[in-house]
């Protein structure tokens, strides 16, 4: 199911809960294509016109789905934007922008591609938004903004899902060709007892 409220009235959760063991929640890729926003934010940012977050999705779904059936998600890919307006006070969220040709035409790029193409050597600085718990890269010269999950934002998500006692999935495995992100998941859930409630 999608993490945003869009199309929510199409689901009869009372009926589905009788037959579905768990729900993979697509809590990523709700970006607007004409305004910069984080790909997979854990918490909301008031300047993000999309006004969406994983935490928001969880609190929406917990009213309709048993907690032990909820599996939230992380992204092993990112989105690249060209910002089309001036930047003031380093605020890059909520700016007029468009997806650029990246690894794919829609601005989509795997995590391994981000590491090799949107790094310090290519003029990018990497930032962590402490409010939304989101990582992004930005090039002040070209005004290219890239939003994605990295080990820091992924650890924040893992702590969240452990606290809520829900599960974690990701999309997709092919984006992590050196297993950096997979290792973060393993290292930060190691020793956790596997059971139906936690799904770790």
What are these regions (language model features)?
Residues 172-179:
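A short, acidic, flexible beta-alpha connecting loop/helix-capping segment that sits on the rim
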Residues 36-43, 179-194:
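C-terminal helical cap(s) of enzyme catalytic domains, especially alpha/beta-barrels
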Residues 13, 54-59, 158, 179-186:
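Generic structural signal for well-ordered alpha-helices
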Residues 5-16, 147-162:
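Short, acidic/polar
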Residues 47-48, 142-149, 169-172:
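Active-site rim elements
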Residues 71-73, 167-172:
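Conserved active-site loop/cleft motifs that coordinate metal ions or position small ligands
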Residues 1-112:
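Substrate-binding surface in catalytic domains of secreted glycosidases
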Residues 76-159, 187-200:
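Glycan-binding loop/region signatures in secreted carbohydrate-active enzymes
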